[in-house]
Amino acid sequence: MLQYPHINPVALQLGPIKIHWYGLMYLLGIFAGWYLTRYRAKVKPWAPIKPEQVGDLTFYVALGVILGGRIGYIIFYNLPYYFHNPSQMFFLWDGGMSFHGGFIGVLIAFALFARKIGANFFDLGEFIAPVIPIGLGAGRIGNFINGELWGKVTDSPLGMVFPTGGPLPRYPSQLFEFFFEGVVLFSVLWLVTIKKRPRYLVLGLFMFLYGCARFICEFFRQPDPQYGYIFFNWMTMGQILSIPMILLGAVILIAVFIKTRKNKCENI
């Protein structure tokens, strides 16, 4: 059995002001995304934005992630609770962010920013997709430090006892998601971007691979108590929300494949 490290969720306290690791992980993901996006804007001839525009894009994306992630969590996962406790909506440091809500928020941010600078929405998505897993991975580390979103009870050597998860060992599902949705997904997408490839291949891969990784990791994660299993006595809300991403990613990949076969797909 693994030992849970018991990290204080508060990284730094300055008088009454508490700086939480959860928030720092989001800041780390946003900063890393800004840095790599700026680098890509300098070296990629087809980049839909200029390096000096990356700061503004990062601001739009950060708002989309935070607002979309929080609103998505409230709507998708715990609406009755927040309806009766509206002040809790603003306590982001306690956790409670939805990737799928954040993804919708980012899509809206992309649409607004693309319209502002006159860029193509899908080109912008293709350009940003390789750096998104960094933020996903950082967020999962924040979940792990918070001791939330732990996995199912297990007798596996990978199990650990979480402070809020009862006395039995559980899968560290946050670390599984960090590895597959963060490390593996980033590595795959970044390697694909090194060489020329069909336009929108990376966008399709991101949506398809993330959806598959999340769907599989949900089998190790404890279902949300307010929902449990929604369909077939095994399907969770996270899996339901991942299915549209898998399907849309598959559609994009099939379209790219067909255009490539017909020599109608531009390589970038």
UniProtKB/Swiss-Prot annotation:
Q: In which pathway does it act?
A: Protein modification; lipoprotein biosynthesis (diacylglyceryl transfer)
Q: What positions does the entry give for a 1,2-diacyl-sn-glycero-3-phospho-(1'-sn-glycerol) binding? A: R140
The terms describing its cellular component in GO are:
plasma membrane
**What GO MF annotations does this protein's record show?**
phosphatidylglycerol-prolipoprotein diacylglyceryl transferase activity
In the bilayer, the protein is annotated as: Multi-pass membrane protein
According to its UniProt record, the EC number is 2.5.1.145
**Which GO BP terms, alphabetically?**
lipoprotein biosynthetic process
The keyword Transmembrane helix is assigned to this record: yes
Protein's cellular compartments? Cell inner membrane
The portions of this protein that span the membrane are 14-34, 57-77, 90-110, 117-137, 174-194, 200-220, 238-258
Entry's family note: Belongs to the Lgt family.
Job description of the protein: Catalyzes the transfer of the diacylglyceryl group from phosphatidylglycerol to the sulfhydryl group of the N-terminal cysteine of a prolipoprotein, the first step in the formation of mature lipoproteins.
- Give the protein's recorded name: Phosphatidylglycerol--prolipoprotein diacylglyceryl transferase
Gene name per UniProt:
lgt
